[in-house]
Amino acid sequence: MEGGFGSDFGGSGSGKLDPGLIMEQVKVQIAVANAQELLQRMTDKCFRKCIGKPGGSLDNSEQKCIAMCMDRYMDAWNTVSRAYNSRLQRERANM
């Protein structure tokens, strides 16, 4: 068994680590973790808002509430994300 990160990081097989490849893999892992956290938060908030008495199935009003809640949550998240990215770009341009 090899080290904790496996052999994917070497790239050329020479045993040297490729910093660019490592950065890309870290970025992918961060993006996946962020998506999982977003989904978990959205699920928790919408469940608490829409499901009064958990049962074997969702009634029609609960289904509509969940769908609308998730749509609003994603819209809000996208709006905040765009504003944040725009601000980061402006700040980078001013450096």
Curated annotation (Swiss-Prot):
Residues where N-acetylmethionine is found: M1
Disulfide bonds: C46-C69, C50-C65
Residues carrying N6-succinyllysine: K53
Lipoprotein found in the keyword field: no
Topological type in the membrane: Peripheral membrane protein
Primary location recorded for the protein, binned into one broad class: mitochondrion
Tissue specificity comment: Ubiquitous, with highest expression in heart, kidney, liver and skeletal muscle.
Subcellular location: Mitochondrion inner membrane
One GO term (biological process): sensory perception of sound
Subunit record text: Heterohexamer; composed of 3 copies of TIMM8 (TIMM8A or TIMM8B) and 3 copies of TIMM13, named soluble 70 kDa complex. Associates with the TIM22 complex, whose core is composed of TIMM22.
Comment, domains: The twin CX3C motif contains 4 conserved Cys residues that form 2 disulfide bonds in the mitochondrial intermembrane space. However, during the transit of TIMM13 from cytoplasm into mitochondrion, the Cys residues probably coordinate zinc, thereby preventing folding and allowing its transfer across mitochondrial outer membrane.
Protein name: Mitochondrial import inner membrane translocase subunit Tim13
Protein species of origin: Homo sapiens (Human)
